[in-house]
Amino acid sequence: MTDLNDNICKRYIKMITNIVILSLIICISLAFWIMSMTASTYYGNLRPISPWRWLFSVVVPVLIISNGLKKKSLDHSGALGGLVVGFILTIANFSFFTSLLMFFLSSSKLTKWKGEMKKRLDSEYKEGGQRNWIQVFCNGAVPTELALLYMIENGPGEIPVDFSKQYSASWMCLSLLAALACSAGDTWASEVGPVLSKSPPRLITTWEKVPVGTNGGVTVVGLVSSLLGGTFVGIAYFLTQLIFVNDLDISAPQWPIIAFGGLAGLLGSIVDSYLGATMQYTGLDESTGMVVNSPTNEAKHIAGKPILDNNAVNLFSSVLIAVLLPTAAWGFWPRG
C-alpha cells in the first residue's frame, strides 16, 4: 500500500511540475511577444513576431533537448547550448529549424548505431554521444550567427532562396544550410564509414592505408555517407520551404537546395578530413592497439600535427564551407 501511495505521489508531483513548466514557458513566450510588439511600435520598421511563433520556438526546442538529455545524446552543458541554438534558429526561420532538427536526430541515431563496435575502435567513444557545450558551439555557432544576421537583415520568417530578388538574405540562408550540411556530412561519414567499409581508410593527403579512426582517413563508404548526410539536411530545408513559403510560384526554383545540401556535406567532409590529416594529431597506442588524438609515450605517430583538436577542425570546416559555397552557388543558381 505504501509503494502504491508513493507511486501516486510521484506521478502527481511530476504532473504538477509539467504544468508549472508549461505555464512558465507560456509566460516567457508572451513576454517575448509583448517585447516584440513594443519594439515594433517604437521603431516602426520592425515586423512583430506572432505569439504562436514565440511559443513554438520555446516549447519545441525544450522538448527536443529534454529528450536528447534523457537519451544521453547531450550532457547538461550541451543541453543548455542546444537550447540557445535551437531557439534562435527556430524563431528566425522554420527551414533553419527543420534542418537543425534532422541533423541532430540523424547524428544522434548514427552515433548510437553499432556502439559496441565503435567503442573498440575509438578511445574517446561515449555512450549515446553525450555532446557537451563545446561540441554544440563548434557545430552550432556558425548557424546561430547567420540566423541572427538573417533576422537583422530580413526579420523572422521564411523566404524563397532567390538571389535576383533578395541576395543578402538568400546568401545567408544557403550559408546556414551549408554549415549544417557540412556538420551532418562529417558526422555521417565518421559514424557510418568505419562500420560499413570493407577496406581500410586511406589518408587523404598521401592516400596511404591507415588504421580505422585516423583523422583524415577516408573511405568510399564514408564519402558517400557524407553526401547522403548533406542531402538529408537539404531535403528537410526544401520540404519546409514548400510548406511555409507562399510566393514560390513567382520565385526561383527551390529544388537546387537539395543538391546544394549534398554538395556541402561532401565537400565539408573532405575539408574536415584534410584539416584533420594535417593539423590534428593521430597516433596508435601500441599498448591498447587503439587510435589516440594526443601524443603519449606509448603512441606511434601516424599523421598530423597537434595544432587543432576535433572540435576546432569541425568549426573551421563549417566556417570555410559556409563562406565559400554560397558565393560559388550564386553563379549557378536559377533566376526567378
Curated annotation (Swiss-Prot):
- Cellular location(s): Membrane
For this UniProt entry, what's an example GO CC term? membrane
Which ranges does the record mark as transmembrane? 15-35, 49-69, 84-104, 218-238, 257-277, 313-333
Tell me which UniProt keywords the record has, alphabetically: Membrane, Transmembrane, Transmembrane helix
Keyword Lyase carried by entry:
no
List the membrane topology term(s): Multi-pass membrane protein
Q: Where's it mainly located? A: membrane
Protein family (similarity comment): Belongs to the TMEM19 family.
Record's protein name:
Transmembrane protein 19
Designated gene of the protein: TMEM19
